[in-house]
């Protein structure tokens, strides 16, 4: 295991390095034995690393250090052409960070202790004073040209929380582009401003799920979402609201959604708690076609095509 406690503004490089954990040598279930752990610091570049078979995460970014009016978030971290494979809890976790870029990385074969995601962006629970300072956040995270495959949980999990007392989200600005989810999917909630563009999502269950905590400003654009199970009862994209969680400005556009036995898109909204747009999508072989009158008046629905 490598722990990085780096301070200052100079650049720190780690490259062409392999870490093999002892997951196969122990039956003990654990979550904290990480291959690489970045607790502090900024301007860090990880390049061409492999971190696998760890009894925690392949890469962990975050800390629990709190101090009034000082931000101790790890920041400006670039992870380039790295492979996180066969780890026990996650391929990679981010619990606190600002400006993290993943480029050309692989998150594969995570299996052991839930959530078992390829990449999990999930702030830890902290006391209310820390929420008010907004310094315990996950913000400005970019995922480009990455590959997620055969993880026991989600390919990508973005698990935010309720707004703080100032009405702000602590998960903000998540961007996913040109990435492939092979036998994987995306679960995202409790956040503001997430964009997923030009991605292929091949799943054996649902493709996308938003629920649990209120979510704002989500764009799913130019994505191919396909269920690989021939006979199934799944939904391609599901957004679910209750009296306690409403979702605003959810936009699904220019996507092709294929072979979901129940719905291509299902907005489970009995309280008019979802607003957004569903436009210019193509549905292939989906069990039930969504009609405009199935949706709340806050949803713009037009120019979608159904090919049965």
Q: What would you call each of these model-derived segments?
A:
Residues 11-18, 42-53, 72-90, 98-111, ...:
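Right-handed parallel beta-helix
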Residues 2-3, 23-27, 34, 55-61, ...:
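Short glycine/acidic-rich loop motifs that flank beta-strands on beta-rich extracellular proteins
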Residues 1-13, 22-43, 58-70, 94, ...:
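Extracellular beta-strand-rich solenoid/capping regions of secreted or surface-exposed proteins
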